[in-house]
Every structure is written in structure tokens, then in C-alpha cells.
């Protein structure tokens, strides 16, 4: 630090003095003293750094209240709405499935008022928080009962803990999956107190492999749907119906983790087939787990369907209380499931399915409408084009299947990657940030998930 800079440090006002200035009164009333003091400390640290580097005061030091208000206006909430133009519909980092309007309304109502979360109107006493949603799930899938926890990882962990702690769990080697966040089935089994017994090989597993692994300490026969990868070629796998029959023969419960889980046949919408929970229940599987916020299109939740005797054991375990869903989740899940009672209106009412089934021709027309106004804004520095591309479903759902789509691409005229980086960085600071993807030296805006063209143009023109 140079000697010339020292007097300038003493010109920086004390925080207490600043907070007591009359000009600060409106800010104190709006934001409170804790946030103001914290923000002033940040500004003072930046002012010291500026003095140390340039040996002068920053311009904004002449008007601390104005500088403070500007900084407070720039503060962003922890969760901020964005334009998802990445091409991944169920983007884990961007919150997965958007909720239906009816689910949003149900959550809002649950937040505003006392609700019958664990209260029975029939008996005027304590009820069970999963009951209403469980009844709806059973009606939709044919399951005897259901259990709801806060996500599918929790569902798998609860199932393994209750059904097979201290026992062996038999799983095919080709199904020992890892999902996002290093969530590995073998690790989960270890934490649940289970002993993993691998059978078969990576690409081929037969019913006899399961049968040969069964002994007096076998607690569970398990299948895991490989929702985030695919093994093709010389393969063989045991069906849920075959494994369920073996379990019944040997008096050993069976379970399948579906991961995504869809309550409707996706092929009716032109999408690839995905196993449905009701198919597994009909095949005789004792317990089935899947997510609420993937193909189902609801809130984050872990759903366990199955035989009543096993679901009751899950509900009674102390771990269930630690993993239970709150009233907002249950309200959103209930409203989402009710949409499935009218399957012919599902595309119209369920946002995630609407985005997944959006025709490529409609997306191309959107790109044509946006091209000219965006060239007017960015054509000086970038070459803008309309390109065909492939969207993906995301969240580990149908990993090898792609959806035909269209994108706007931005190619920097100076050929520099830093120009693209500067553009994407600026778009991340917008009131509603725009998130695309960079590939092949271009920025791609896949328009599959864009439903408000005017709002996007307002942001990008700002």
C-alpha cells in the first residue's frame, strides 16, 4: 500500500455514522439495519480496494446513500426465474419440471391457510399426511398403498433401510447406477446397512443368477431402471414379472427403482416408451419408487407404491418422519396427479408434457419471428442463424432419445471465445437471465422451452 493512499482511507465514513444520516432513513425503513450494514461493509471493502489500486476515491464515494440504493437494487434472490434455452427440458440445475397452474394455485392456498395436513374431517382427529395423495396414486396405478417422501433418493434409502437392513440385496451388475451428485446404488445400500450381492454381468443377467444368489439372509430382490444410460447389443435382462414370481416363490419381497417414472404411455404423444409404475404393480412387484418432478411433471418428491403390508412398515419407521414431504409438496403433488384423471387434456394442462411434445414446426416458426429483432440488437458483433438441433428430456430420463428442435445461434464476428463468454455473462445479469449453451464456437438458444417470446425480446433488448 503506498503512502499517498493512507489519508484516503481515513476519508471513508464509519458505518454507524452512515446509518444515522437522514438520507438513510428511507432505506432503513425499506430494508432494515442488518442488510444495510452488511451492504455498507461490502461497499467499504470495495472502496479500500479501489484506493489501494488507483490511489484515489471511487466516484460513488461522493454519495453513499445513492451507491447503497443502487447496490441494494442489484441484489438478487437466491432462486431467480430464468429463460431455459439450454435444450434440456427437465434441467436438474434449473429446477426440473415447471408446475401446472392448478398445482401452483394449490401450493399458494396451502401456504396462506391452515390445511388438513394431518387432520381427519371425518373423525375430527389426527389423520395421516400421505393419505389423500396415496388414495389418488392407488386409483391411478392399482397399487394397494403409497408412501410420499421428499425425493426419490430418500425413497430408495427408506425402502432399503426398512426392508433389508442387516440383510442381502440382490441386484444385477448392469443396474448398479450412479445418478447426479454421485448418488450410487452400492453406496446407498451400504449406508442403509444392506449387503449388496451382484449377479450376472454388465450386459447379461438371467433369472438363474438371482435364484442362485438367494439364501437365508436375502432380504430383497431389486431391479434399478437404468434411466440415465442404455446398454445395447448382446444383452439379456430379467423382467419385473419374472423377478416378482421368483420373489413370491421364495417369500422374498421385490422392489424396482424406476427413477423417472411416468403415469402415462409416452408413446401416445410420439415420445419413446418409458416403464410405468402401474405396469410394475400389475407384474407383481412389491414396491416401486420414482420421482415426482421428472416425467410426472410435479414437485420434487419420492413416491413409493406397493403392497399395503410393506408400505405400512415404511410409514411406521422413524426415518419416514425425517424424510416426509411438507404441505406445499403434497398440495402440488395432489393437484398434479388430478390432471392425470383427464388424460386427453394432459398436454394442455401439464407444462412439462406440453414442452416435450411441442412440434418442431412450431419451434421453427418461433425462431423465424425472433430472428430479425435480435439481428437488430446483436447483428453488429454476431452473425445470427436459425439451425436445427436436438433437445433432450433431461434429469436422466430417456438418455439416448432426442427431440427435434430449432435454435437461434450467435457466432462472434471476431471469432473470439471471449466475446461469447462476455455475452453469456451479461445475459446472466439480466432481470430474468437467459441461459443457453455454447457449442462449436457458437451460442445456441434452443427455443423448445420458450413460451413468452415478447418477454425474451424485452430482456435481450435491454
From Swiss-Prot:
What SUPFAM superfamilies does UniProt report for this protein, alphabetically? PLP-dependent transferases
| Any GO MF annotation of the entry | L-seryl-tRNA(Sec) selenium transferase activity
Record-linked InterPro entries: PyrdxlP-dep_Trfase, PyrdxlP-dep_Trfase_major, SelA-like, SelA_trans, SelA_trans_N_dom
Q: Which residues carry this modification: N6-(pyridoxal phosphate)lysine?
A: 294
EC supergroup of this enzyme: transferase
Q: Could you tell me which pathway this protein works in?
A: Aminoacyl-tRNA biosynthesis; selenocysteinyl-tRNA(Sec) biosynthesis; selenocysteinyl-tRNA(Sec) from L-seryl-tRNA(Sec) (bacterial route): step 1/1
User: Would you say which domain of life the source belongs to?
Assistant: Bacteria
One GO cellular component assignment for this chain's record is:
cytoplasm
The protein's required cofactors: pyridoxal 5'-phosphate
Record bears the keyword Protein biosynthesis: yes
Its EC number is 2.9.1.1
The reactions it catalyses are: L-seryl-tRNA(Sec) + selenophosphate + H(+) = L-selenocysteinyl-tRNA(Sec) + phosphate
Q: Where in the cell is it found?
A: Cytoplasm
Q: Which UniProt keywords apply?
A: Cytoplasm, Protein biosynthesis, Pyridoxal phosphate, Selenium, Transferase
Q: Give the GO biological process terms.
A: conversion of seryl-tRNAsec to selenocys-tRNAsec; selenocysteine incorporation
Instruction: Indicate the family of this protein.
Output: Belongs to the SelA family.
Q: Assembly state and interactors? A: Homodecamer; pentamer of dimers. Binds only one seryl-tRNA(Sec) per dimer.
Function of this protein? Converts seryl-tRNA(Sec) to selenocysteinyl-tRNA(Sec) required for selenoprotein biosynthesis.
Name the record gives this protein: L-seryl-tRNA(Sec) selenium transferase
Organism name: Yersinia pestis bv. Antiqua (strain Angola)
What's the gene? selA
Amino acid at each position: 500500500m503506498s503512502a499517498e493512499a493512507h489519508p484516503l482511507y481515513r476519508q471513508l465514513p464509519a458505518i454507524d455514522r452512515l446509518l444515522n444520516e437522514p438520507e438513510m432513513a428511507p432505506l432503513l425503513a425499506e430494508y432494515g439495519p442488518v442488510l444495510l450494514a452488511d451492504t455498507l461493509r461490502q461497499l467499504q471493502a470495495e472502496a479500500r480496494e479501489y484506493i489501494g489500486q488507483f490511489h484515489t476515491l471511487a466516484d460513488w464515494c461522493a454519495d453513499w446513500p445513492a451507491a447503497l440504493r443502487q447496490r441494494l437494487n442489484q441484489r438478487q434472490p437466491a432462486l431467480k426465474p430464468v429463460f431455459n434455452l439450454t435444450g434440456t427440458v427437465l434441467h436438474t440445475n434449473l429446477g426440473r419440471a415447471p408446475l401446472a397452474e392448478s398445482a401452483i394455485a394449490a401450493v399458494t392456498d396451502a401456504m396462506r391457510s391452515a390445511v388438513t395436513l394431518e387432520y381427519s374431517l371425518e373423525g375430527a382427529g389426527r389423520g395421516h399426511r400421505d393419505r389423500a395423495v396415496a388414495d389418488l396414486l392407488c386409483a391411478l396405478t392399482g397399487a394397494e398403498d403409497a408412501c410420499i417422501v421428499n425425493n426419490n433418493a430418500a425413497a430408495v434409502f427408506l425402502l432399503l433401510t426398512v426392508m433389508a437392513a442387516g440383510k442381502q440385496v440382490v441386484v444385477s451388475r448392469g443396474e448398479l447406477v450412479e445418478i447426479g451428485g454421485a448418488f450410487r446404488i452400492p453406496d446407498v445400500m451400504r449406508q442403509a446397512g444392506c449387503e449388496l450381492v451382484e449377479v450376472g454381468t454388465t450386459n447379461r443377467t438371467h433369472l438363474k443368477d438371482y435364484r442362485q444368489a438367494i439364501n437365508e439372509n436375502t432380504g430383497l430382490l431389486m431391479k434399478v431402471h437404468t434411466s440415465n444410460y442404455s446398454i445395447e447389443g448382446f444383452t439379456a435382462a430379467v423382467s419385473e414379472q419374472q423377478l416378482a414370481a421368483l420373489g413370491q416363490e421364495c417369500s422374498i419381497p421385490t422392489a424396482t427403482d424406476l427413477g423417472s417414472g411416468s403415469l402415462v404411455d409416452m408413446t401416445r404423444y410420439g415420445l419413446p416408451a418409458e416403464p410405468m409404475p402401474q405396469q410394475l404393480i400389475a407384474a407383481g412387484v412389491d414396491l416401486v419408487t420414482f420421482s415426482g418432478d421428472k416425467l410426472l411433471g410435479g414437485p420434487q418428491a419420492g413416491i413409493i407404491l406397493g403392497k399395503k403390508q410393506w408400505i405400512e412398515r415404511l410409514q411406521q419407521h422413524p426415518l419416514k418422519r425425517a424424510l416426509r414431504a411438507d404441505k406445499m409438496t403434497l398440495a402440488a403433488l395432489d393437484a398434479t396427479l388430478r390432471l392425470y384423471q383427464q388424460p386427453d387434456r394432459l398436454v394442455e394442462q401439464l407444462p412439462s408434457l406440453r414442452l416435450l411434445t411441442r412440434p418442431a414446426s412450431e419451434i421453427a416458426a418461433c425462431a423465424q419471428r425472433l430472428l430479425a429483432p435480435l439481428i437488430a440488437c446483436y447483428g453488429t458483433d454476431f452473425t445470427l442463424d436459425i439451425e436445427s438441433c436436438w433437445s433432450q428430456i433431461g434429469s436422466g430420463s430417456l438418455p439416448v432419445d432426442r427431440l427435434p428442435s430449432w435454435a437461434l445461434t450467435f457466432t462472434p464476428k471476431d471469432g473470439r471465445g471471449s466475446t461469447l463468454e462476455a455475452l453469456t455473462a451479461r445475459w446472466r445479469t439480466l432481470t430474468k437471465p437467459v441461459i443457453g449453451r455454447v457449442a462449436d464456437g457458437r451460442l445456441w438458444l434452443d427455443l423448445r422451452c420458450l413460451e413468452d417470446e415478447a418477454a425474451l425480446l424485452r430482456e435481450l433488448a435491454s
